[in-house]
Amino acid sequence: MNEKATAAYTIVNDLGLHARAATKLVQLASKYPCDVQLSHQGQSANAKSVMGVLLLCGSKGTVVEVTANGAQADECVKAIGELIASRFGEPS
């Protein structure tokens, strides 16, 4: 079955999508078989690419749209949302 899921999330950690946070996001996205894209201000990036995620320049307060296509798309988008909401595991 070909699923599609999309959701928008606000980056809430103080340092934004820096290297460590981007790596955690990519590692999580890579656990799912679906294609995953992040979008911000007309730019999009493969959520399974650290360089792509870093190039989006997601600072605190940035709203990113997560779109997944394929098997487990909904679960993937929700998991990424939970990671973002948890500040990528960083202290608040």
Task: Please state what every model-predicted region is.
Residues N2-A8, V63-E65:
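Intrinsic-disorder/low-complexity, polar/charged segments enriched in Ser/Thr/Lys/Arg/Asp/Glu/Gln
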Residues T10-M51, L55-K60:
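Compact, glycine-rich, soluble single-domain proteins
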Residues T6-A8, T23, N69, D74:
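Intrinsic disorder/low-complexity segments
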Residues S59-S92:
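C-terminal structural segments of small proteins and small subunits
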Residues T6, T10-V12, L83:
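Residue-level signal for pocket-adjacent positions within structured domains
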